[in-house]
Amino acid sequence: MDERPVLFFDSGIGGLTVLREARVLIPEIQFIYVADDAGFPYGNWEENILKEHILNIFTNLLTRYNPALCVIACNTVSTLMMADLRQKFPHVPFVGTVPAIKSAAEQTKSGFISVLATPGTVKRAYTNELINSFAGQCHVQLVGSEKLAGFAEDHLRGKTIDSEALRKEILPCFVKKNGKCTDVIVLACTHYPFLINFFREQALWSVEWIDPAKAIAKHIRSLLPLSEKIHQKPIKKYQDFALLTSKNITASTEHLLKGFGLKLMKRVDFRIRDQ
């Protein structure tokens, strides 16, 4: 079995929703979680600048850690530049997180779907390609929120969430027309599942919320070789750890990562140029 780590990457803590599902399926694997909190949020970055920024980070990470596989646990980056990453680093498998529009189209009964994402994901051509390919017969409402990812970060650090402000962010997802209404909402940002209880409380009516984390974890598992010791409980040889690009690491952040079983590695130089 390949003992190299699996590297997760996100702009913040949203990718932890996918990491926790991957751990269930492959507990013996070492995971490295990288949060580019210095660059958070990605939704409003200029595309070319963001691409260069991400490629610089991965040039450093892949040299330093030689992962068996990289998970881009960020919808904004996944819809923007998976092809760029695969082209620049052809020796490394990359798994992306893209809006689960196909699943939504398969599950909807009304034909009304909403995609709750960041502004960056909403405006990507790739998102529209997914809609045209898998949901051409559906009414698809794209909703780009500038605040929800930040709300998720605050919530996990124990801060109070303004329920009314959150409600305003999700209201456009609820569409009613010609006697039909939205019945499926895609969570197209890995941060958003952390807010699912708030979403259900503030929803105008009952809907199916699609979190693709489990499906992504299964895909990750399928790309890794099976352990030869099938009848033995898998043993993790190396501790999981997290890296943050920001040098302003708070006690609440460190406590949060510890709660997810991640040791915070400090004083790591990412050699990122200031934008």
Swiss-Prot record:
Function: Provides the (R)-glutamate required for cell wall biosynthesis.
InterPro entries named in the record: Asp/Glu/hydantoin_racemase (IPR015942), Asp/Glu_race (IPR001920), Asp/Glu_racemase_AS_2 (IPR033134), Glu_race (IPR004391)
Organism in which the protein naturally occurs: Bartonella tribocorum (strain CIP 105476 / IBS 506)
Transmembrane segments: none
Documented EC number(s): 5.1.1.3
Active site residues per record: C74, C189
GO molecular function, one term: glutamate racemase activity
Protein name, as recorded: Glutamate racemase
Enzyme superclass (EC): isomerase
GO process annotations (BP): cell wall organization; peptidoglycan biosynthetic process; regulation of cell shape
Keyword annotations of the record: Cell shape, Cell wall biogenesis/degradation, Isomerase, Peptidoglycan synthesis
Catalytic activity field: L-glutamate = D-glutamate
Annotated positions binding substrate: D10, S11, Y42, G43, N75, T76, T190, H191
PROSITE patterns: ASP_GLU_RACEMASE_2 (PS00924)
Similarity comment: Belongs to the aspartate/glutamate racemases family.
Signal peptide interval: none
Pathway: Cell wall biogenesis; peptidoglycan biosynthesis
Top-level taxon: Bacteria
Pfam name, any one: Asp_Glu_race
PANTHER family per UniProt: GLUTAMATE RACEMASE (PTHR21198:SF2)
